[in-house]
């Protein structure tokens, strides 16, 4: 049997494209000759300007409904072929927000609502408003970026002696994202595939004490990298996974097996 070629959607929208994972994904998609629409709350991701070949940049705060409406209009005007969406935008544990981290009495309802708006509601509303486009274009696919904390409780011993935290709204939003994945997979079938990736901890300059404790719990002996997650997203976007939908691909080096 010869080597099979695989295809990606013609255009892929990446939210949260300014972060470490989002920017790495944009780079990988461009390398595969995919037209990328990148969006984030900041102007561009470092070190590349918005004019980078293969990437059309839209600055948008997905917490704001009017920004999501504008984003959808831009996607409609540019997506002439099959469409992929990677919902990656999210508040993360290191986000510097008042009422975000710390003990539960320090976590505000306002910030809880903001986190769910960006991580979950924005993913729902953007997909809803592009459903007609997705359904008419064979090869369209959606990938949600979830987390192992959608289904695992945090091990607080990992965080001792550090400024790192694991806010309640983060995991709750990601759990919602995974159920949205399953709901959309059955609702948009057979024309659109919908899957998710659930990364474990990615090594991003955390304190060495945290890294050592975390890696001691990982059967593969290390924290993840952006490349580990990007490769999984590429698989789920492409025709390599043509018979896969409604699934959550856990990319954690076996952390969740412990």
Residue positions per predicted region:
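A conserved structural motif in NAD(P)-dependent oxidoreductases
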Residues: 218-229, 240
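Alpha-helical segment proximal to the catalytic Tyr-Lys
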Residues: 132, 182-190, 242
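Catalytic loop of short-chain dehydrogenase/reductase
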Residues: 105-111, 135, 143-186, 201-202
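Canonical Rossmann dinucleotide-binding motif of NAD(H)/NADP(H)-dependent dehydrogenases/reductases
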Residues: 2-37, 184
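Conserved NAD(P)H cofactor-binding loop of Rossmann-fold oxidoreductase domains
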Residues: 88-101, 253-254
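Short, small/polar-rich loop/turn modules that mediate ligand/substrate recognition or access, typified
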Residues: 139, 189-193, 244-246
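Short C-terminal tail/terminal secondary-structure segment
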Residues: 2-6, 154, 234, 245-258
């Amino acid at each position: 049997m010869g080597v099979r070629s695989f295809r990606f959607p013609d255009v892929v929208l990446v939210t949260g494209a300014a972060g470490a994972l989002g920017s790495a994904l944009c780079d990988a998609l461009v390398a595969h000759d995919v037209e990328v629409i990148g969006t984030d709350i900041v102007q561009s991701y470092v070190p590349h300007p918005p004019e980078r070949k293969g990437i059309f940049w839209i600055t948008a705060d997905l917490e704001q409904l009017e920004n999501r409406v504008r984003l959808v209009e831009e996607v409609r005007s540019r997506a002439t072929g099959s469409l992929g969406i990677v919902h990656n935008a999210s508040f993360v544990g290191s986000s510097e927000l008042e009422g975000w981290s710390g003990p539960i009495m320090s976590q505000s309802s306002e910030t809880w609502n903001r986190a769910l708006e960006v991580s979950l509601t924005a993913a729902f509303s953007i997909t809803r408003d592009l459903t007609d486009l997705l359904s008419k274009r064979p090869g369209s696919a959606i990938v949600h970026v979830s987390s192992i904390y959608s289904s695992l409780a945090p091990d607080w011993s990992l965080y001792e002696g550090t400024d790192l935290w694991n806010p309640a709204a983060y995991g709750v939003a990601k759990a919602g994202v995974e159920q949205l994945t399953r709901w959309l997979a059955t609702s948009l079938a057979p024309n659109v595939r919908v899957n998710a990736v659930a990364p474990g901890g990615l090594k991003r300059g955390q304190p060495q004490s945290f890294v050592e404790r975390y890696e001691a719990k990982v059967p593969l002996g290390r924290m993840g990298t952006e490349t580990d997650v990007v490769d999984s997203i590429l698989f789920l976007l492409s025709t390599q996974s043509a018979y896969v939908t409604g699934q959550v691909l856990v990319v954690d080096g076996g952390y969740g097996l412990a």
